[in-house]
Amino acid sequence: MEKEIGIAVFDTGIFSSHIDLRQKTVAFSDYVGRRKNPYDDNGHGTHVAGIITGKRYGIAPECRLVVLKVLDSKGMGKSKDMLQAFKYVIENRQRFNIRAANISIGTGSKGKLSNMLVEGVEKMWDSGIVVVCAAGNGGPYRGSVTYPGVSKKVITVGAFDDEEYMDNVGKLHHNYSGRGPTSECVIKPDFLSYGGNVMSTSHKGGYCLKSGTSMATPKITAIAAKILEKHPEMKPIDVKMYLKEAAVKLNEPLNRQGFGLIDPKEVLKKI
C-alpha cells in the first residue's frame, strides 16, 4: 500500500484535538513558542488544516499533516523562521512522504528576505514538493501578489469570490484577491478557487467561516494531494499542468485568473 500523502502546512499551528483533526498530525514544529505539543493561538492554521484534511469539510481527509507553526497569535511571523521551516520540510520529505506544501501566508515587503523566501519555496519545489501559495488579499491593484507567491515555479492561488474580506483589524476590503503581474512580468495568480465564507474547523472547537485567498489556497493543495494519490509518479510541474487542463477560463484578465477557476467538486470527479 502506498504511504499516506504528507502535506506541510505553514501557519499559526493546529488545534489537533478537534474531533475532525484527531490523528491527522504526524509532526509539529514550533518556530514561535518552541513548544513540543501542537497548538493554535490564532485559529487561521486550524481553519486551513480543516479545509485540507478535516473529516467533515476536508477535501483530502486521508492525508496527514506536517504542521509548521511560523506565525504567532496575531498572525505575524519572521522570514528567518519560515526559512528554517522550509529546510525542515525538505530534510524530512521522505520521512513523512511530504508531497505538497500549503503556504496561506504572504508579505508585500520587497527586499533580500522576501527574495530568500522565494528561493526557499523554489528549493522545496525542486525537491519534489508541490508548493501552493496564497496570492494575498492586497488586490485589486496590479502587482499585488505577495511573496513568496510571486515565484514563477510554485502554484499561486487567488480567490474567485473576493467581493468582501474583513482583515484582522476589522477593515473591510473589496475585490481583495492579489493580482499580477510580478516585478519580473510573470502572470500570477496561476489559478482561482473559492475563498469566500468557507466553513472549516475552529481552534476553539466547532466550526467557523473565514474568507480570503488563505481559504482558497488549501483547496488547491488538497486537490494536488488527491492527484498525487492517484498518480504518485508525478512531479510538481506535472501536477501544475494537470490543474491547468482542469481549470475553467473566465471572462477575466490573465493577471486576475491565471489559467482559470478550479472547482474542487468538478476536478475531484475526474481524478
Task: Give the label of every model feature segment.
Residues 1-27, 35-80, 96-99, 150-154, ...:
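Subtilisin-like serine protease catalytic core
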Residues 7-9, 27, 64-69, 97-104, ...:
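Structural recognition of the beta-strand scaffold that forms the well-ordered cores
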Residues 11, 19, 149-229, 233:
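Extracellular S/T/G-rich loop segment that most often corresponds to the catalytic His/Ser-adjacent loop
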Residues 12-15, 139, 266:
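Short, glycine/acidic-enriched loop or turn micro-motifs at the edges of active sites
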Residues 49-52, 66-72, 101, 191, ...:
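Hydrolase catalytic cores
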Residues 57, 87, 91-94, 126, ...:
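Generic secondary-structure signature for well-ordered alpha-helical cores
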Residues 71-153, 183-186, 201-211, 215-216, ...:
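Substrate-binding/access-modulating region of protease and related hydrolase catalytic domains
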Residues 260-269:
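Catalytic cores of secreted or luminal carbohydrate-active enzymes
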